[in-house]
Amino acid sequence: MKYGVIDVGGGLRGIYGAGVLDRCLEEDLRFDLCIGVSAGSANMASYLAGQHGRNKPFYDEYSFRREYMSVHNLIRKHSYLDLGYVYGTLSNAGGENPLDYAALARSPAELCVVAANAQNGEAQYFTKADLHPDDYRIFMASCCIPVIDQPCVIDGVPYFDGGLADPVPLEWAFAHGCDRVALILTKPIGLVRSDARDKHLAHLLQSHYPAAAEGLRRRAWRYNTAVQRAQELERQGLVCIIAPDSTEGMSTLTKNRACLEKMYAKGKQDAEALVRWMQNAKQDESVGT
């Protein structure tokens, strides 16, 4: 039986997924295929490296620094989020909070990091083979928010946030051999995503990256359709959805320490359902054999 886990990210709301995955580390829950979109990709990296608690300060401490995200960055570097600071300065060996690359590489689990090709709008599914010591550009690509950030270029190809192309890569997980999938959302299940803001941003992006702009226009539909499908599969016992009952008033880039703490605590608490689901699935598997 192959078990997968997906963390869809969601900007600073991604601290919820960090809480879920920290609880998974505490319970020694292991997955065979780990898929991250946007901030979810960074959460997944720390989970695979076994670095409990590593991601939390990226949300509730570092994000308040001017170097991380600010109008100053937008004026000086033409990007509101300095992803080089996040995934380079802070995360490289010798940085303030380095990713344990060796531990990540040793992990037997597969890693998939989803980004959107800015030129053709298609999803790019990066793997461990695309990671190298102190070269974490695939995470930058997956987290690169269009319009407020310049695209992240890898091997001459510009990339934006993976949510533009495959915001909830559930079908990809099953197509790549998963029998059961845990899905971590950062919005309540019943909250239908609106496309109003995305359509406005798409208009601003249209002249330079028309395919990526179309991805923005379709993002809400793709997300809502995938979540609906996940609910159908959950009723069949094939998917376990972990989602907060509230966003605590947080949007993608809301910087509020109290709300961030609540979202992290919710993630750890809500992960109890995932623990039980995995235990039951493993039990059923052993009985079946």
Ranges and model annotations:
Residues 1-37, 45-289:
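Patatin-like phospholipase
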